[in-house]
From Swiss-Prot:
GO terms for biological process, alphabetical: microtubule cytoskeleton organization; mitotic cell cycle
Tissue expr: Highly expressed in bone marrow.
Acidic residues: bias regions: 430-440
Physiological role: Tubulin is the major constituent of microtubules, a cylinder consisting of laterally associated linear protofilaments composed of alpha- and beta-tubulin heterodimers. Microtubules grow by the addition of GTP-tubulin dimers to the microtubule end, where a stabilizing cap forms. Below the cap, tubulin dimers are in GDP-bound state, owing to GTPase activity of alpha-tubulin.
SMART domains: Tubulin (SM00864), Tubulin_C (SM00865)
InterPro entries: Beta-tubulin_BS, Beta_tubulin, Tub_FtsZ_C, Tubulin, Tubulin/FtsZ-like_C, Tubulin/FtsZ_2-layer-sand-dom, Tubulin/FtsZ_GTPase_sf, Tubulin_C
GO CC, alphabetical: cytoplasm; microtubule
Lineage of source species: Eukaryota, Metazoa, Chordata, Craniata, Vertebrata
Keywords: Cytoplasm, Cytoskeleton, GTP-binding, Magnesium, Metal-binding, Microtubule, Nucleotide-binding
Protein name listed in UniProt: Tubulin beta-6 chain
Organism name: Gallus gallus
Family stated for the protein in its record: Belongs to the tubulin family.
Length: 446
């Protein structure tokens, strides 16, 4: 089977990760002791993608939990889903990274990284045919961002031909935990541009907006936000976990979604959006799902897709529905809104249909868009970064761990280059003559 090794790192990564395992073990009929108690053969058909089958039909998540302080790990271990995980796969330091990227990447994290790599190797050895890794982390703290990117680099060195997929929680201006978030985020983005194949950008601000506007929650907790993220993650990984009519693995997803290697930052979306514990009263039709799924308010990244253009899109529909109807709906979205899709990539919307809906819903749809508007997210963080970096504010915390100012300038430059690349492809047209003229008369440099 094509296995995926799952890594969750830092406080945010572990909290979302625990929720993710709760959702998918439920979908596959695995109870908290790791025993199968479902009733559909489809649940077991591709269970090996995320679970190891241990002795006497016990299923154990192929998951590695990492943090630089014991707190979050202890709460995951003692939560109701704790017994499901393999005890050896909990790896933690005791010092913490103190929201400092340099501690996670160069000092504290670097001391722990070999222990993590041993567990990674161990997990990879028990795979028949490893397809890749997925890592959940946030970019605003110290461990998820600093040590997370260090781990990505190490895995890249050792398994260069395997897909590296990340779910990265990007800091947002309205919901800030620490002042140095922009530093940590830009230093991480610099690494993600070079070393990952696919990055799903999840944004706390967008999640809060969904909770306030759509779900009408007055004071949303991190639990509510994590619920939304786990819905999306479960949706994105559906076609990897269940047999369906158009099955994707991580590599096929990357081939369909990434037209240029650096432009691999996706906006996820989900429909229908429901609050935790609430049931949906009526089933949505395929046209309603499609319309909601492309709606800016359903996006998990705080960018407006209408201000950019889609390079590529992947949609995953779940539930019993007619594939033909799904195809017709998506075709109509493309023809009615053709200006929002770049014309130089024909057929840039791909669809997968899986018969098993998520718990509590008859039908659902997950959206993955590679839209040039994602640059708004990078511009936002980059502006905050520059404001502090120009005054060298808080820099001593980083240089004290052995970092150099050059690294900051380099990361900022790389992020700004990424923004220009997105802008360039947003403005690009399919006119061949125009392109040839530009080639023929190179502009004179002033």
């Amino acid at each position: 089977m094509r296995e995926i090794v799952h890594l969750q790192i830092g406080q945010c990564g572990n909290q979302i990760g625990a929720k993710f395992w709760e959702v998918i073990s439920d979908e596959h009929g695995i109870d908290i002791a790791g025993n199968y108690c479902g009733n559909a053969s489809l649940q077991l058909e591709r269970i090996n993608v995320y679970f190891n089958e241990a002795y006497s039909h016990k299923y154990v998540p192929r998951s590695i939990l990492v943090d630089l302080e014991p707190g979050t790990m202890d709460s995951v271990r003692s939560s109701k889903i704790g017994p499901l995980f393999r005890p050896d796969n909990f790896i933690h330091g005791n010092s913490g990274a103190g929201n400092n990227w340099a501690k996670g990447h160069y000092t504290e994290g670097a001391e722990l990284i070999e222990n993590v790599m041993d567990v990674v190797r161990n997990e990879c050895e028990s795979c028949d045919c490893l397809q890749g890794f997925q890592l959940i982390h946030s970019l605003g703290g110290g461990t998820g961002s600093g040590m997370g990117t260090l781990l990505i680099n190490k895995i890249r060195e050792e398994y260069p031909d395997r897909i590296m997929n990340t779910f990265s929680v990007v800091p947002s201006p309205k919901v800030s935990d620490t002042v140095v978030e922009p530093y940590n985020a830009i230093l991480s983005i610099h690494q993600l541009i070079e070393n990952t194949d696919e990055t799903f950008c999840i944004d706390n601000e967008a999640l809060y907006d969904i909770c306030f506007r759509t779900l009408k929650l007055t004071n949303p907790t991190y639990g509510d936000l994590n619920h939304l993220v786990s819905l999306t993650m479960s949706g994105v990984t559906t076609s990897l976990r269940f047999p369906g009519q158009l099955n994707a693995d991580l590599r096929k997803l990357a081939v369909n979604m990434v037209p240029f290697p650096r432009l691999h930052f996706f906006m996820p979306g989900f429909a229908p959006l429901t609050a935790r514990g609430s049931q949906q009263y009526r089933a949505l039709s395929v046209p309603e799902l499609t319309q909601q799924m492309f709606d800016a308010r359903n996006m998990m990244a705080a960018c407006d897709p209408r201000r950019g253009r889609y390079l590529t899109v992947a949609c995953i529909f779940r539930g019993r529905m007619s594939t033909r109807e799904v195809d017709e709906q998506l075709l109509s979205v493309q023809t009615k809104n053709s200006s929002y899709f770049v014309e130089w990539i024909p057929n840039n919307v791909k669809v997968a249909v899986c018969d098993i809906p998520p718990r509590g819903l008859k039908m659902a749809a997950t959206f993955i868009g590679n839209n040039t508007a994602i640059q708004e997210l990078f511009i936002r963080v980059s502006e905050q970064f520059s404001a502090m970096f120009r005054r060298k504010a808080f820099l001593h915390w980083y240089t004290g761990e052995g970092m150099d100012e050059m690294e900051f300038s380099e990361a900022e430059g790389n992020t700004n280059d990424l923004v220009s690349e997105y802008q360039q492809y947003q403005d690009a047209t399919a006119d061949v003559e125009e392109y040839e003229e530009a080639e023929a008369s190179p502009e004179k440099e002033t």
